[in-house]
Structure formats: structure tokens, C-alpha cells
Amino acid sequence: MSYYVLSKIFLYSGYLVIGFLSFTIFNKNLRNKIRDKLKNLYFLYYLTFFTLFIISSNLSYYFTEKQLLEDFNIFEKEFFEIHKINEQFFQKYLLNFPVPIRMELMSKFDPLYTVFNASFEKYAKNIGKSSYEIQTNYKNYIRTTNSEIKEKLEQIKENITPIYNKYKLPILNGENTEISIDENGNIIPVIKNTNGQITELLFYDQNYNLIPFKKFESYKVRFDLIPENKNINFKELINVYYLDEKNIITPIEYYKNNIDMSPYYIDLQENKDDFLKAIKIKKEYGLYIEKKKQLQNLTENDKLDDFKEFLLKNNNIFSLNTIFSNGNPIFTYAINVKAKSIINYLITKEFNINLTNQNSQTALHSAIIQKYDLNFIKSLIEKGANPNIRDGDNKLPIDYSDKTSEIYKYLIGI
């Protein structure tokens, strides 16, 4: 008899116990007969059924897990096929987000628990099974408490980690850039020629665009290859620096300090065949996220003085282009929560007014959706807001305005 059959026998036995116990509870005559017969031991009747139910449930669960363990090789094949499909959907989903939000999402990411329904549906269609059946079986394995199964899951999880970890690396035009690293494991995006030589370093500007890193302040950015170290698995290390007025080498720590867009590092000492398995999160990143929440709260409550003081104290990690964890840039979020004082302050400052949120909407989209008046819309246009940017639904800002409104007439005339 299979473990599956045994688990079902004990499962339905438990149902029968509960059914009979419920019948007793709701049948007054039967309750009275049992009470008269058992007298002071009446409680044992219910205790016996409760005990039988617990035993049946535990045995059902035990044999279910035994069956899962026996079928693990079959599940393992399904697991890899599902995640091959899932990575395609994951890429499409993740690349819609600005870099800081993508990095933050990856910091919370666990591949075992992040499988799209569409992945189950596509896999089920490929093999001619029910999507519900595939999904239920997958969840049964993920939720198991069996230590042997959990150990096996961790082993196969390690094999799929690289296909997801690559999204922690810099991405340009939908593809990972080439990378090098410094002696501390900080990830440095680079461009290489056809001979595999580094020709250019890249960095994220304040608008979250990946661009050539040629100037640091007023100095020319330079780099040297660090001689090979047998104790380091990642072979290509570089030293990034500039020469000051006295021709003294000064290290550039952009890649170390830019926690917003570069929160990960490669563990150079960890003995891994594939460096993608050795990507880790910088310890400062958790504090950065907490501070970003503080800034968001100040914006939401329109506390301008505290807002300005906070940015002044943390200007090395935050700017007016910072994007909050909810996917909104500071200015867009201020518009959404109608933080009037902060809006009036920000509009006098220099920042990228066309940064998009998690829905690919700009501040202009949000202002029209939130029904701000014509004067405010005009001030955004004068500030440089682009009325021709489409959001995730392929809509222009004007598409959210009433066609009889002054705002519509103004935007249509631009």
C-alpha cells in the first residue's frame, strides 16, 4: 500500500471522527444518553474522539511527507522546468522597475517562494496537466517540515540561485553588463572590447541611468588591474582612482558608497565555482532602507523643515531623485499625498522631474490623476515635465484628463 493511500485513509478517518463528534454535539438525545451512561467520565468520550482526530491528522501528514520524499526525484525535474519558465516572467516583471526598487525587491527575494501563476500555467500546459495540481504539489514541498526534504530543497535551490542572482548585477538595455570588482568585492559594471579587455567603466548617475564613468568631481577616472591572487576566485580585480593636483593616487569609493543602486558585493573568499552564487548584500543596506522609510514618512506628513534637515544630514546616500520603497520618486510621492510645503520647496530645486514610478508614470501623470489645477500642471511643464511619456498602460498624461477640461486644452496645444 502506498504512502499516498495511507495518508488518505488517515485523513478521511479524521473527517469521520469529527463528523461523528459533531453529530454527538448537535444531537441532544444522544448527548444525554452518553452522559447518563458515562456519568463522571463523560469528558472521556470527547477526549477520546479528540485524541483520535489528532492521531489521524498526524499520521495523514506523516504519510503525506513520506510520499513527497519518495517522489522527490520527479518533483526535482518539475522544479527546474518551472523555474526555467519562471525566470522569463521574472525578467519581464523586474525590468519594469527603476534600479533602486529592483535592488530592494531582490534583497527580499527567495526563489522557492517567488513563482508566478503564469509559470505554473505555462508548465501545466506544456505537460498536459492541471495548473492547480502542479501548484498544489509545489506548495506541498515548499511548506514541508520534513528535515530531509528541506535539505534537498536547499540543494536544488542553490542550483537555480545564479539565474536569479544575475538580476542583482548591473543591467543595460535589458542585458547584464560585463563586470569587474574591486578588492572589497564591490561590483563594477564595465564595457569590454572583442579581446576581452576593459575599455570603459560604467556607473549610475542620479537619474538611475548607467553611463560611462569618465569624471569624478573634476578629475579623470582611472583604473588599474590588480595582480592575480590565488586566494581569490574572481580573477579580474581593478583599482579605481584619480590623480589629484599633486599627482597622488586617490581611491574612488563610488562603488562602495553607492548603496542605493549597488547594495550587493561578491564574496571573494567563498569557495564557489560560480561567482553568482557568492553575491551577498552589504550590511549597510538594511539601515539605508530604514532611513528611506523615515524620509518617506516626513514627506507623507509634509514636515518640510525635518525633510530638509534629513536630506542635509544624509546627502551622501539620498537626493531629490531618491525613489521610495513603494516605487515612487520623492516628488511624485509628494504629489500623491498632497504634501504642499514639500512640493513648493522641491519645485524650486534641481532634480529629474521625469523619473517614473513603479507604473512607469511621471509626476505629470500623477498630478493629473490627483486632479491638481491648471496652474500646477503649467508649473510642471515649465519645470521640464515631458507630456509625451507613456506609462505602463501606454497612456500619456493627457489621457487621464477630462477632454472638456482646461488642462486637456492646454496639453493638447503643446
Curated annotation (Swiss-Prot):
Q: Which domain of life is it from?
A: Bacteria
Q: Where is the signal peptide?
A: none
**ANK repeat locations:** 326-355, 359-389
The UniProt entry, under Pfam families, shows:
Ank_2
Entry's InterPro entries?
Ankyrin_rpt, Ankyrin_rpt-contain_sf
**Keywords, sorted A to Z:** ANK repeat, Plasmid, Repeat
- Coiled coil start-end: none
What is the protein name stated in its UniProt record? Putative ankyrin repeat protein BB_B28
Query: Which species is the source of this protein?
Result: Borreliella burgdorferi (strain ATCC 35210 / DSM 4680 / CIP 102532 / B31) (Borrelia burgdorferi)
